[in-house]
Amino acid sequence: MDMNSFSPMMPTSPLSMINQIKFEDEPDLKDLFITVDEPESHVTTIETFITYRIITKTSRGEFDSSEFEVRRRYQDFLWLKGKLEEAHPTLIIPPLPEKFIVKGMVERFNDDFIETRRKALHKFLNRIADHPTLTFNEDFKIFLTAQAWELSSHKKQGPGLLSRMGQTVRAVASSMRGVKNRPEEFMEMNNFIELFSQKINLIDKISQRIYKEEREYFDEMKEYGPIHILWSASEEDLVDTLKDVASCIDRCCKATEKRMSGLSEALLPVVHEYVLYSEMLMGVMKRRDQIQAELDSKVEVLTYKKADTDLLPEEIGKLEDKVECANNALKADWERWKQNMQNDIKLAFTDMAEENIHYYEQCLATWESFLTSQTNLHLEEASEDKP
């Protein structure tokens, strides 16, 4: 049973029981809608950064209002991601886009970069909103509703530097010890993640290369239309034909541009998001292993140093519960993530295949129409030449 769906509130009457039944075919009623838009650039003497408007509309009772509007910068999104990982170490947190991918600082905040990031941040928040557990996280609610000064104040309430350093040291120590007896199902999960990471990174590189080649092809093809127009000015007998060729090239250029837009907006972001997911999954597995390694070390101490371990059995019991909760959370989220991944990848490639079919049909029809017109023209000229 999924513990997240269990409610301790028992129905008090047959009618209330019927009202609480949820049929599998019944669609989920979405009650949280988030939009990320209107990026704004801010320049100070210290730094330059972008903030994004976040509009939240909800019918949930735990929110003080039905609509909220706040502005957040990338650092705030990083904070939220960190808090979610801290609260749910073995849940699969959606990935954030990289801080920046640039060749030079001049390109850092160009329009394409800002729009690409805006879309990624929008997807990040909506994936959290759609998650059965993360959507009810208190830090997520504060992120969506608190004004800037309130969020800043809330951030300061977290663990201090020394506490965070202590957690890091313990995590490193656990990872150094490693896990001696990782359960078989998590061995299989780890193998899947490694193989998935290799394949999705390869697909990402190939997709980027295809887009680059498409861009080069498009840039070169754009030059041929004007060339044929200029050529027609010096060929009196071929004026109409050359202009028709230029028109066909122009239509094919527009079709190519549309296909490139589909590639850059539909396929590339999905593939790259799952590249980032593969990195997130490796982090989740490490955190699960750290929890188990902590339990293993306590059991080892109890086994070899029984004289000085009066409190160890109680600690071990708590750690066993912690490991069980971590494992169950990961297993449930793993199946959910795999289903979403398969649906997303399938939809992206299916849409791209349909886009390609439409593109080639459009270009083929353009040139077939041109050839038909030229054939008819030659037939007319031939009939006119007959005595």
UniProtKB/Swiss-Prot annotation:
GO molecular function: phosphatidylinositol binding
Principal location listed in the UniProt entry: membrane
InterPro entries registered for this protein in UniProt: AH/BAR_dom_sf, BAR_SNX7, PX_dom, PX_dom_sf, PX_SNX7
Membrane topology type: Peripheral membrane protein
Alphabetically ordered keywords of this record: Endosome, Lipid-binding, Membrane, Protein transport, Transport
Coiled coil, from the record: none
Residues noted as binding a 1,2-diacyl-sn-glycero-3-phospho-(1D-myo-inositol-3-phosphate) in the record, renumbered to the chain: 73, 75, 103, 117
Entry-linked Pfam families: PX
Intracellular or extracellular location(s): Early endosome membrane
Top-level taxon of origin: Eukaryota
Cellular-component GO terms for this entry: early endosome; early endosome membrane; phagophore assembly site
Residues covered by the BAR domain: 178-387
Location of the PX domain: 30-151
Biological-process GO terms, alphabetical: endocytic recycling; mitophagy; piecemeal microautophagy of the nucleus; positive regulation of autophagosome assembly; protein transport; reticulophagy
Subunit and partners: Heterodimer; heterodimerizes with SNX4.
Recorded family membership: Belongs to the sorting nexin family.
Functional note: Involved in the regulation of endocytosis and in several stages of intracellular trafficking. Together with SNX4, involved in autophagosome assembly by regulating trafficking and recycling of phospholipid scramblase ATG9A.
Protein name: Sorting nexin-7
Gene expressing this chain: SNX7
